[in-house]
Amino acid sequence: MVPVEALFGYVLLLVGFVFFGNGLTLLGKTGAKEIGVLNLAVAVLISIAAWKLHTLGLTAGAALISAFALVYFMVAAIFCLGYDAKGLGWYCLFGTVVFLWYAYHFYALGTAVPAIAGVKWFGIFCAAWALLLLLAFFTLALGKALGTAVAYLFIIEAFLTLLIPGMLLLTEKWNPLGGVPG
């Protein structure tokens, strides 16, 4: 297995757990503290993976993963310590811009380099995550009543943009990077 793709699969799988758990929490199906602990654990684990990607020369991928990790550190503090979520809401606005840029980057890269055309999927995933973060901004920072929509989008994206592609990467059924060596 190519180490880079395995690391991306690992990160996608872990982030999928967080998306699913956060969605269930927003629907009132789980306790905030237990999902806060999950957010903290995943933030630490994907930060380590991001550092490994950085040492392999994939700093852009490491930065994308680090943006997720920062969200999860903040969510852990909100869920476990009861902090206000407005700051997270404003971070989500910034994150929306970051994920839109990555969506463009991955889609353009996959179009320009046919050997790695599969990275266009990461562009689609980033666009989906940007939508989620934009709705979270409206909900958390501006107080719009979109919590249920955000919860269901978390759950849907947990499967479609994270669990399924993560498992495909981990089981070597998908090779979007064309075998980039690590």
Where are these regions (language model features)?
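N-terminal topogenic module of multi-pass integral membrane proteins
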Residues: 1-54, 153, 167-182
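Residue-level signal for well-ordered alpha-helical segments
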Residues: 1-4, 57, 111, 115-118
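Long alpha-helical, hydrophobic tracts
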Residues: 3, 7-9, 14-17, 54-69, ...
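Aromatic/pi-system hotspot detector in well-structured domains
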Residues: 12, 19, 114, 126-133, ...
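Hydrophobic alpha-helical transmembrane segments and adjacent interfacial helices
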Residues: 20-24, 44-55, 72-79, 97-111, ...
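Cytoplasm-facing juxtamembrane segments at the starts of transmembrane helices
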Residues: 28-41, 81-97, 117-125, 138-160
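Generic local-structure boundary detector
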Residues: 31, 35, 51, 77-79, ...
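Membrane-proximal helix-loop-helix units in multi-pass membrane proteins
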Residues: 62-133
